[in-house]
Amino acid sequence: MNAALKSEVESRHAELAAICARLGVRRLELFGSGTRSAAPRDLDFLVDLGERPPAEYAAAYFALREELESLFARPVDLVTPPGLQNPYFRQRVEQEKTLLYAA
């Protein structure tokens, strides 16, 4: 993670943890341009929301995306572990990911 984004994430860690706890997030990890680029235009997160009824899962997913976009003032993409079907994509995510929150 570049220094500017690291500072931004660290300064908002308490807010980030509160959002994750409130929405029942198990793990939240940053990957993609946010871990490589000096000034990423968007942020990519790998999120584990655990097992839930479909409506509750969808509500948590979209609420998390909205709150992260508001917190970091830029577009956010969320990927869940089942979305890592492509082995090349999965490998890239595994290499780049940085843990931000774990319940």
Locate each region found by the language model.
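Short, aliphatic-rich beta-strand segments
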Residues: D44-V47
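Catalytic core of pol beta-like nucleotidyltransferases
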Residues: M1-E29, T35-P40, G50-A103
